[in-house]
A protein has these predicted regions:
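N-terminal ligand-binding lobe of clamshell/alpha-beta domains
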Residues: 1-128
């Protein structure tokens, strides 16, 4: 897979364990393929009954600008989803250096949002 920044992201497919560092993407995952979500930020407040929807505990990994990288690594995610604007490049780099696959979205327009999410869900989660 190639993320929105053109970086190759190697993952086992279909992805089974995801940490989302982007509140809007957390909501999209929870509503589309909830079983894969194992971690998200403290700012991921929608859907309001997240754990009820996904059917298991979703570990909170602090904020979008200060994620707990150790907690993320300990969750053994197949994929971490981040956003170029929302998350720090430093955290993405350190997660990748630790062997964690990170997909970074870059969304400036509605069209880019639709395209990015479509690719992520089709290529990463096997959702068609």
């Amino acid at each position: 897979m190639i993320d929105d920044l053109g970086v190759k992201v190697s993952v086992a497919r279909p992805v089974q364990r995801v940490v989302s560092l982007v509140p809007s993407i957390t909501e999209a995952i929870a509503m589309t393929c909830p079983h894969v979500l194992v971690g998200c930020t403290d700012y991921c407040i929608r859907p309001t009954h997240l754990e009820e929807i996904v059917g298991h505990e979703v570990v909170r990994v602090r904020g979008t600008k200060n994620p707990d990288r150790k907690a993320i690594i300990d969750l053994r995610p197949d994929l971490v989803v981040a956003n170029q604007e929302e998350n720090r490049e430093h955290d993405v780099t350190l997660l990748r250096e630790a062997g964690v696959a990170v997909w970074v979205t870059r969304i400036d327009t509605v069209e880019e949002a639709i395209s990015s999410l479509t690719r992520l869900f089709e290529e990463g989660f096997g959702v068609r």
